[in-house]
Amino acid sequence: MDNVRIGIVGLGNIGQIHVNNLLEGKVERGVLTAVADAFPDKLPEYEAKGLKTFDSGEALIASGEIDALMIATPHFQHTTLGIAALEVGLHVMVEKPISAHKADAERLVAAAEARPELTFSGMFQMRVEPRYQKIRELVQGGELGDLIRVIWIMTDWFRAEAYYQSSDWR
């Protein structure tokens, strides 16, 4: 099978993690070829790694340099970038949440459904953890009965105020 040329738009915290995972060969058949970010001062670091760089997601999408796009931008950009990528025939993986509003999520999903030959996914990494798999098994197996409401409080995922101050969109 051929390798998939991947581009990443958004080089903040999670975007950098995706870059490193791809450059370290942790994604079978995935080859990072290009990145985009709205802050041009970030781009020389990636050019030095041999990647093509773009100053906007739209430019990356139109470049012809990639087969698939990973979207790691602020939430409010997920819908427009995802739809634009799908419309030109790119596979799309978008960070959570897939959109900032329900109506936008529905538009993005509809765009993906209109292109069944493409792969579209949202990054919800917790779904593969054993504890969440067990809960899914219990719910789907009916062992908990008919659920009307679930209140779930996670107390092991603390973020200091500095995290929220690190970007004006958080």
What label would you give each PLM region?
Residues 1-49:
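N-terminal Rossmann-like dinucleotide-binding module
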Residues 57-64:
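Short amphipathic alpha-helix with an adjacent loop that forms part of the alpha/beta core around
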Residues 51-57:
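Conserved SAM-binding strand-loop segment of SAM-dependent methyltransferases
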Residues 68, 74-75, 79-127, 142:
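Beta-strand-loop-alpha-helix segment that lines the small-molecule cofactor/substrate pocket
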Residues 2-4, 118, 148:
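Nucleotide donor/acceptor-binding cores
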Residues 35, 69, 150:
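Receiver (REC) domain switch-region micro-motif
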Residues 126-170:
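Predominantly a Rossmann-like dinucleotide-binding segment in NAD(P)-dependent oxidoreductases
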